[in-house]
Amino acid sequence: MKNAEIAAMFEKIADVLELRDENRFRINSYRKVARVIGDLTDNIEDMARQDRLKDIPGVGEGHAERIGEFLRTGHMHKYDEVMAAISAFFMY
């Protein structure tokens, strides 16, 4: 199941946003979704196939798009973006 992998990605995004001192509500949103997805008993891939991602508490249009992108492509642009930014930060 991809649940744990996606939950970890959302948690890491929240960590980086927090390091960058970004909007607290946005950080909390990512943390909540990470926690909820990590606790899901349903397979998130099945939920995506059934167009039920937005049934997950805290998952709106943006988070659903990110999850769907990862399930389709194996990559999440937002995750890649924040990880690249934090890597660049620690290089200097």
Language model segments and positions:
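Long, highly charged, low-complexity intrinsically disordered interaction regions
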Residues: 1-92
